[in-house]
Structure formats: C-alpha cells, structure tokens
C-alpha cells in the first residue's frame, strides 16, 4: 500500500505542475511563482520559444506547413515575373501562283514567324569573345585577299596561267509566229578585242606573211581556218602578249586537223617550217617494193635474173660510150661526194625529225590548255568575221579561186 500511495502522490504533483504552467501569468510580475512541491515553474511564451510541452512530443512543425511555405514563396516570385509569351504559330497565306487570262490560280504558302528580334537574341547569346556583327563572308574574303597577295608575289617569280572561262549558254528568240515564240539555246562567244589584236599583230610577222603568200591555193589557210585560230586564242586562256609565231602555227595545224581530211595539207605546214624531210624517201621506196612484191608473187622468180640484166646493161652502156674507161677513174670521187651529201642530208633529217616531235608535243599542250574544246560552230566563225568585215584576211575564200 505504501508503494501505491507514493505513485498517486507523484502523479498528483505532475498534474499540478502541468496545470500551473498552463495558467496565464500577470504581466507586472517579474518572477514566476514557486509551487508548493518545491519544483520551479517555467514561463512559456508560444510566439517566441517553442519548448517541449510534454515528454515524447515532437516540437518540430509538421511537414505540411513547410511545403506550404515554399509554395507561397514560389507563388510570390512567379507573380513578380512577367508572364512568358508563347511563340505564335506560323500563319498561312494565299499567294498568286499563275495568271491565265481572267483566271487566277492561288497557292497556299506558310509565313515564317522568325522576326529580327530573334536574330538579336541569338547574337546576344553568343560567346563574349565572338563578334556577331561581321558575317562569315568577310572572313572568307580576308582569306581570299591573303591568297591574292601571295599569288601576286608568286607571279613575280613564275608567271601563272589563267584558265579561260567556259562559254555560257543563253536563250535567244529564233522565230516569232503570232503570239508564239520559239527559243533556241545559243552559246556566248568568249572572243574579246584583245584576241583580234593579238591575231593582227602576228599577221605582221615576216614568216607568217611568207607562209600566207606561199599557200596560194588556200589549202591550209582560208578564212574559216584563220577564224578558228582566233577562236582557239580565246579558249587557250593565255594573255594577248604571250601569243607568238609558234602559237599561230599550232592553232592553224589543229584547225586543219579538225576540218580537213587531207593529210598532205597538214604536212605542208611542216614542209614550210622545217623543209622537206628526204630521209623518209628510202623507207617509202622500201615499203613500196615490199607492197609490190606481196601483190606480185612471181617477183621471186625474176629476182635471179637481176644480176644478169645489170651486167648486160653495163656492157651495152660501155659499148655505146667508148669514154667510159676514162670516166671510170672519177667514180671514187663521185661516191665520196655522194656520201658527204647523204650524210649532210641525214643530219638535217635528224634535226627536222626532232623539231617535228617538239611541234607535236606543243600542239598537244595547246590542245589541253583549251580543255579539249577544239570544235567551233559556224555561228561563232561568222561572229569573228563580223568584228572587222573589211579585213584583208577574210578575202581568202576558196570559192573565189574557182
């Protein structure tokens, strides 16, 4: 019984403490009252200090109040910021696509929503070290200027070849019939006045003058072939001052190769420049003999009679010319002179052969400089002749010879 009484007493003291702590205290009192049990009572203010009210109770505020406070703060900040404008959707308009008399065909076209403000915003978001004002084209132009300066320096050391631009194509009206018009594709000629000046300058060369006077039959130098020479000058892409005598003959040989089927006419150019090559005559005679032998199978049987015929021809000539014995002593001298003459001709033949090979090599290089465009249309030839129709070269027409 003593234990139960002590327990009830302790419980009563605890309840008294709780009741006294809950009672309101007067404001003029500075010190709290002491309980009869001897335990000090603490003054608790709910607004300032959050102390434990009872054992086992968590004094922290609930999670809902903290989340609600965060939501209130987020709502206050969002209220201060302006509302974000949504991008307008692209509009669609109707534009006129085709007019046909009183009928009109419309086409639906979408309008782009991109504004200048978007470009400014994009430029402002670039890196701070990047200048958005100059376009990329200026940087490329700077590279081109640097390359041009380097090329000018290299031009002083070695001349740079300028490639000729390819001819452009345009559409011209060929025929008009009422309200209908027929179009035809036509190439624009690249012949410039400077090419005519280079051609006229070469005509004053004494070698070219002798060549034109030598070709009386106009087999290799009529007006159309000479007009093709000017067209080739424009396509080769060389400067006008760079064309020399060799370029005239190269272009003329190439023009004959394109237009003429006669191989002898092209060989006449070699005959005039380097002389007739007589070193090929023995080879031609040998081939001619082989061809005749293949055509006549009986030539082998007659071959055994050749020494007998030579012997009889010699005897006949000796009997007809009694002075043959006296002239016999001159044979070694004649043989010696003939050998010297043949040797000098062989040296010239070797020289001429090397020059012809060099000419053919330069002709191929000239053909490559024109990018293989050796064909010239009749319309372009007429345009070239119409530039100066009173020129004396255009009077070299084969029709006037007959």
From Swiss-Prot:
One GO MF term attached to the UniProt entry: protein kinase binding
Region (Disordered): 1-89
Annotated signal sequence range: none
Biased composition (Acidic residues): 76-89
Pfam families: Spy1
Superkingdom of origin: Eukaryota
UniProt feature, compositional bias: Polar residues: 16-39
Family of this protein: Belongs to the Speedy/Ringo family.
Protein known as: Speedy protein E5
Provenance organism: Homo sapiens
């Amino acid at each position: 019984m003593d234990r139960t009484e002590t327990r009830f007493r302790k419980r009563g003291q605890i309840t008294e403490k709780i009741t006294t702590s809950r009672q309101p205290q007067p404001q003029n009192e500075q010190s709290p009252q002491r309980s009869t049990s001897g335990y000090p009572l603490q003054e608790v203010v709910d607004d300032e200090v959050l102390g434990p009210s009872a054992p086992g109770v968590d004094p922290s505020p609930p999670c809902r109040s903290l989340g609600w406070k965060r939501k209130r703060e987020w709502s206050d900040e969002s209220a201060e910021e302006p509302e974000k404008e949504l991008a307008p959707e692209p509009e669609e308009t109707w534009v006129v696509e085709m007019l046909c008399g009183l009928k009109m065909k419309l086409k639906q076209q979408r309008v782009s929503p991109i504004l200048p403000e978007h470009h400014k915003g994009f430029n402002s978001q670039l890196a701070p070290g990047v200048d958005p004002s100059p376009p990329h084209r200026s940087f490329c132009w700077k590279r081109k200027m640097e390359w041009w300066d380097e090329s000018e320096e290299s031009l002083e050391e070695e001349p740079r070849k300028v490639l000729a631009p390819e001819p452009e194509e345009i559409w011209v009206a060929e025929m008009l019939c009422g309200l209908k018009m027929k179009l035809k594709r036509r190439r624009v000629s690249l012949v410039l006045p400077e090419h005519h000046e280079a051609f006229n300058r070469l005509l004053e060369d004494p070698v070219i003058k002798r060549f034109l006077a030598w070709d009386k039959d106009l087999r290799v130098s009529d007006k159309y072939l000479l007009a093709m020479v000017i067209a080739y000058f424009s396509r080769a892409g060389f400067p006008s001052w760079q064309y020399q005598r060799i370029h005239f003959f190269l272009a003329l040989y190439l023009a004959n190769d394109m237009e003429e089927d006669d191989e002898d006419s092209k060989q006449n150019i070699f005959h005039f420049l380097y002389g007739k090559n007589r070193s090929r005559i023995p080879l031609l005679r040998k081939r001619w003999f082989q061809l005749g032998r293949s055509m006549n199978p009986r030539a082998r049987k007659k071959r055994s009679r050749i020494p007998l015929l030579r012997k009889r021809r010699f005897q006949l000539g000796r009997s007809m010319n009694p002075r043959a014995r006296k002239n016999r002593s001159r044979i070694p001298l004649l043989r010696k002179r003939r050998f010297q003459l043949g040797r000098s001709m062989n040296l010239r033949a070797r020289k001429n052969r090397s020059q012809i090979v060099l000419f053919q090599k330069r002709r191929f290089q000239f053909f490559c400089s024109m990018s293989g465009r050796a064909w010239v249309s009749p319309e372009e030839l007429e345009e070239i002749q119409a530039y100066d129709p009173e020129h004396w070269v255009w009077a070299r027409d084969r029709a006037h010879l007959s």
